[in-house]
Swiss-Prot record:
One cellular component (GO) term of this entry: TAT protein transport complex
Keyword Ribosomal protein: no
Name recorded for this polypeptide: Sec-independent protein translocase protein TatA
Organism phylogeny: Bacteria, Pseudomonadati, Pseudomonadota, Alphaproteobacteria, Hyphomicrobiales
Major localization class: membrane
Superkingdom of the organism of origin: Bacteria
UniProt membrane topology term: Single-pass membrane protein
Comp. bias (Basic and acidic residues): 43-60
Quaternary structure, from the entry: The Tat system comprises two distinct complexes: a TatABC complex, containing multiple copies of TatA, TatB and TatC subunits, and a separate TatA complex, containing only TatA subunits. Substrates initially bind to the TatABC complex, which probably triggers association of the separate TatA complex to form the active translocon.
Entry keyword set: Cell inner membrane, Cell membrane, Membrane, Protein transport, Translocation, Transmembrane, Transmembrane helix, Transport
Length: 77
């Protein structure tokens, strides 16, 4: 009672083919294959090292005077 016989599988496959048709199933499998190829290509692109990086440029701030903070509108107590 727990296992499916060959006739159960034939009926299930027939229903699936009637619902989706041959064209839709092949289109679906083609889309899955394209997705897998795109995923593999993306994984290979991540493995490649960057070709050339430019050195980081730093900005020299020098001796700039620091601003003093004044509270506007506050009353001294």
């Amino acid at each position: 009672m727990g296992s499916l016989s060959i006739w159960h599988w034939i009926v299930v496959i027939a229903v699936v083919l009637l619902l989706f048709g041959r064209g839709k199933i092949s289109d679906l499998m083609g889309d899955v294959a394209q997705g897998i190829k795109a995923f593999k290509k993306g994984m290979q692109d991540d493995d490649k090292a960057p070709e050339k990086t430019e050195p980081v440029k730093s900005i020299d701030h020098g001796a700039t005077p620091s601003a003093t903070r004044t509270d506007v509108g506050s009353k001294a107590v």
